[in-house]
């Protein structure tokens, strides 16, 4: 075994620190006056929001989309040709589009108190037909995810070249219908966010469990209306991601 260069055994630098409990994740961070936030989420896959009623006397502790009118939605776009962009609000506005979509953020001194507060919110949602099969979602009469779209196709692409001629002259032809299941990442650490305004530097400081801090800074700048120099994103130790932590999450916008 070589001591250096290609093929050399490289010792992991972070193992000793983590094995001795010296790692620092978002959940390990603490500061004076820190509040906890719990999110009320939709239990319906598709529905139109009629009302979200806050408990009397606790309105200031609960944030809904009505309180975030100056916050821009996430603009879900791609450089891939044929991709159809859409807006993704930090908190659901007119309708919910999947189970787990954030409806409200509840602020309290402890996590338990924040979750109890979320249970006091009354939500009236008109349930709409939902579809979970991608092929059925392409049907002309399928429920629309976005009301201003004519269909549910978010990407239309094509292959260049004389495919028909090549197929006719091919010595072997194979026809297959391939399906892949839904992908879901399960890192040991879930998503965590801590944010505060640093009056000394005049910056919004965001500690977040992310794989792409610069992308998060850009996204927060676009949605919050701040210049990028006014935002500092710090990723502490990250307990796994596998791509799940490579995008801006609505919860990061709400917390910030």
What are these model-predicted stretches?
Residues 4-11, 34-35, 65-77, 160-166, ...:
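A generic short-segment signal for beta-strand/edge and adjacent turn/coil regions
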């Amino acid at each position: 075994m070589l001591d250096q260069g290609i093929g050399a055994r490289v010792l992991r630098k972070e193992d000793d620190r983590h094995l001795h409990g010296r790692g620092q994740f978002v959940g390990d961070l603490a500061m004076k006056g820190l509040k906890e936030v719990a999110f009320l989420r939709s239990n319906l896959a598709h529905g139109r929001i009629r009302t979200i009623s806050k408990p009397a006397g606790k309105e200031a502790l609960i944030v809904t989309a009505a309180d975030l009118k100056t916050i821009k939605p996430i603009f879900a776009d791609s450089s891939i040709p044929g991709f159809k962009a859409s807006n993704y609000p930090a908190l659901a506005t007119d309708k919910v589009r999947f189970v787990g979509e954030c409806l409200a953020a509840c602020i309290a001194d402890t996590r338990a108190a924040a979750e109890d507060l979320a249970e006091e919110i009354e939500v009236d949602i008109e349930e709409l037909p939902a579809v979970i099969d991608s092929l059925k979602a392409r049907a002309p009469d399928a429920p629309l995810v976005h009301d201003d779209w004519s269909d549910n196709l978010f990407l239309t692409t094509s292959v260049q070249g004389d495919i028909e001629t090549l197929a006719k002259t091919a010595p072997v032809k194979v026809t297959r219908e391939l399906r892949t299941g839904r992908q879901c990442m399960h890192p040991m650490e879930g998503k965590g966010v801590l944010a505060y305004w640093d009056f000394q530097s005049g910056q919004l400081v965001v500690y977040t469990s992310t794989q792409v801090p610069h992308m998060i800074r850009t996204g927060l700048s676009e949605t919050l209306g701040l210049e990028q120099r006014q935002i500092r994103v710090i990723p502490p130790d990250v307990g796994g991601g596998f791509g799940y932590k490579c995008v801006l999450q609505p919860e990061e916008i709400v917390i910030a």
